[in-house]
Amino acid sequence: MTSDAVPTTREPFDPTDVSWTPVSRRLIGARLTVAAFFLVPLLLAALAGAILAGEAWVWAFPAAVVLLGLWIGWLVPRQVGAMGYAERADDLLVRSGIMFRSMVVVPYGRMQYVDVNAGPLARKFGIATVQLHTAAPATGAAISGLPPHEAARLRDRMASRGEARLAGL
């Protein structure tokens, strides 16, 4: 292998010394429900338009909506599967993305506060979001799709680690 060979590792987004915790698979159902909330009325409108128009080419619109729904149904499980977090000694890592990967490193000492959110749909699916707030908005992070007990545990752990790191300043 030459020095200009393309590396096969995902090192910047998947450090080898880290044990990732995945988010709950229930996030898939929540995201697909939101997609269906928008796609079903759009499909009904496209079908009504195609029926009323009486032109064969207009059926391309309902077909496009169906294809979009199938693509979302294929994509969402993969997106959720790529999401995770890892707690290290001095920071929290949060990763997401398939094509456009992202990994945010949040130092415990930079955290100002941590909160847990769960809207009606999230509660129905038994998931919550942990939001980490820092002084710089770019270093904050959110972890969606956590079971409520794990979200509360992570919130308390991050808050206590943040206080311990700030006390050392």
Positions of predicted regions on the chain:
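N-terminal basic, Ser/Thr-rich segments that initiate or prime the first beta/alpha elements at protein or domain
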Residues: M1-L169
